[in-house]
Each structure stands twice: as C-alpha cells, then as structure tokens.
C-alpha cells in the first residue's frame, strides 16, 4: 500500500502538465469551446494558428526581444494578455496568470484568444497566422477530422 501511495504521489504532478494535441483532437476541443466561426474565423484558422505558433503544444513558451514571453498553444503574450510576474508593464487584459495558458485544458487559452480576436486586428494579432495561414486553404487543417 505504501508503494502505491509513493507511486501515485510521483505521478500526480504529471496530471498538471501540458499536452501535445493531435490535429483532429485539437480541432474537436476548439470546436467544443466555441471557436468555429468565432468573429468570422473558421475552425481551420485556429488549428493552423496553433500548429505554427506552438506545434500543438500547450506548454510552449517563447521569450521575445522586448522581455515579454508568449505562452501556450496559441502563444499568448505576457505584455498584453496575461501576467507572468516578470514582464514590466504587463496589461493582463485577459486577467489571468500566464501559467494558466500552459495547461492541457485549453479553456483559459480559448477564452483569452476570444478577447484577442475580438480586437480590431482580429487574427492578425498572431504573427504565425498572418505569415503561414492567412490566405491559404485553412480548411485542410480540419479535413478528415470527425467533428
């Protein structure tokens, strides 16, 4: 019994770790969270953005030259959208800790992304979407998925 307890305690932190989603798995999760056609952007746009922002990895982080960091599956920036406790002048417009964006549960990322895309720039806020997805056949990202 003691061995089982030790084993459970060793693996308990893994439950809080992030996740690398499969393409169709992420498409289904994003659809459940209401991203399909949100602000006029089809589901394929969101899946494409996630691919080129994080390679579908909820734990992705990238430090920027201005000292801010991008977090999670949609690489949401700490200067404007979340608080990481180390970005001077963070606006935290989504009112969340950046660590919430690294969870295997994409709810916080989706809710924040909805605020971002509702801004005047829409999905142009995501550099990877602008450079790799905009104007392409983004429906290819959900083709073959059972949604």
UniProtKB/Swiss-Prot annotation:
Main location: secreted
Compartment(s) where it occurs, according to its Swiss-Prot or TrEMBL record: Secreted
Chloroplast as UniProt keyword: no
GO biological process entries: defense response to Gram-negative bacterium; defense response to Gram-positive bacterium; killing of cells of another organism
Similarity comment: Belongs to the glycosyl hydrolase 22 family.
Comment field (misc): Lysozyme C is capable of both hydrolysis and transglycosylation; it also shows a slight esterase activity. It acts rapidly on both peptide-substituted and unsubstituted peptidoglycan, and slowly on chitin oligosaccharides.
Name of the protein in its database record: Lysozyme C
Record organism: Coturnix japonica (Japanese quail)
High-level lineage: Eukaryota, Metazoa, Chordata, Craniata, Vertebrata
């Amino acid at each position: 019994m003691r061995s089982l307890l030790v084993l459970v305690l060793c693996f308990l932190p893994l439950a809080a770790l992030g996740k690398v989603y499969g393409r169709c798995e992420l498409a289904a999760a994003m659809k459940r969270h209401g991203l399909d056609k949100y602000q006029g952007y089809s589901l394929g746009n969101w899946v494409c953005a996630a691919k080129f922002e994080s390679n579908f990895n909820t734990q992705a982080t990238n430090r920027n030259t201005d000292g801010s960091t991008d977090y999670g599956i949609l690489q949401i920036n700490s200067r404007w959208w979340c608080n990481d406790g180390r970005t001077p002048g963070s606006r935290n417009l989504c009112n969340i800790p950046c660590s919430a964006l690294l969870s295997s549960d994409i709810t916080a990322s989706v809710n924040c992304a909805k605020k971002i895309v509702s801004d005047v720039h829409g999905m142009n806020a995501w550099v990877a979407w602008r450079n790799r997805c905009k104007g392409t056949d983004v429906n290819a990202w959900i083709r073959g998925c059972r949604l």
